[in-house]
A protein has these predicted regions:
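AAA+ P-loop NTPase domains with strong preference for DNA replication initiators
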Residues: 156, 163-271
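P-loop/Walker A NTP-binding region and its immediately flanking N-terminal helices
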Residues: 1-151, 156-157, 163, 167, ...
């Protein structure tokens, strides 16, 4: 059983192992075959494979690339200096690609600087931007990109991926436990995999195998979101919904607001 992070160890390296988004994979395949890519804006919920897809692109075309996490480097100088240095330097390849992850964390001024850099270096440098909230990205950037919504694979596909990982790690498991973990973490695939790895207990002295032992209380604690969405879907009484929220120790209400915002289309249909 590996002690490295499973989310990194089993991150897909090419389109053949990337789960879901078949319609988007066809478009990316065309880019890979042409050895070129336009500016891309990949948006969607956290943990659904946006960054993975961006890395598949740069790892499968002939390019030099740089990765920037905008949640850590989101100020004007951070963006301008790092990108300008990379884009203007002499490279080994004719094409350069910059992955700007979580770009919805960029300040408005930083986004304005990014727009100018995209124009200045457009001949030989492409940008792949990822974000959870596309409405936070200024229009001039959106208009310069091919925008694609990355949707989560089905729960069945996520469960099968989890089964494959556990088998590869020589870990025993119950299918009901996998279903519980998937339901609690979906649609965030990263959260599902991390949750499973945390709850695997080594069963051999040599550390080469393990057993998935679910902490029911931990999973249920994280499952209040699913309960809340179900109650909203079923038209439960407002006091019951308030009680559910009160019964769960929620330290970050912004996460709850994001959940409701993300699911408004799903649970608002026909209302």
């Amino acid at each position: 059983m590996s002690h490295s992070l499973w989310v990194e160890k089993y991150r897909p390296m090419d389109l053949s192992t990337y789960v879901g988004n078949e319609h988007l994979k066809e478009k990316v395949k065309v880019y890979l075959e042409s050895e070129d890519v336009p500016h891309l804006l990949l948006f969607g919920k956290a943990g659904t494979g946006k960054t993975t897809l961006a890395k598949i692109v740069v790892n499968n075309i002939d390019c030099d690339y740089m990765y920037i996490n905008a949640s850590d480097e989101n100020k004007v100088d951070d963006v301008r200096n790092k990108i300008k240095t990379f884009a203007s330097s002499v490279g080994f390849k004719s094409l350069k690609v910059i992955i700007l992850d979580e770009c919805d964390y960029l300040t408005p001024n930083a986004q304005a600087a990014l727009r100018n850099l995209m124009e200045t270096f457009s001949k030989h440098c492409r940008f792949i931007l990822t974000c959870n909230y596309v409405e936070r990205i200024i229009d001039p950037i959106q208009s310069r990109c091919q925008s694609y919504k990355v949707v989560p694979p089905s729960k069945k596909e996520v469960a099968q991926q989890m089964v494959n990982i556990l088998k590869e790690e020589n870990c025993t498991f119950e299918l009901d436990d996998i279903a519980l973990i998937v339901n609690a973490g979906y649609p965030d695939i990263r959260r599902v995999i991390n949750s499973a790895q945390r709850q695997v207990v080594p069963v051999y002295e040599d550390g080469l195998g393990g057993e998935l032992q679910i902490d029911q209380s931990s999973v249920i604690q994280n499952n209040y979101k699913l309960q809340l969405l179900e109650m909203l879907s079923n038209g439960s009484k407002l006091n019951d919904i308030r009680q559910l929220i009160a019964d769960n120790s929620i330290s970050d209400y912004s996460e709850l607001y994001r959940l409701l915002y993300d699911e408004v289309e799903t649970y608002g249909k026909g209302k």
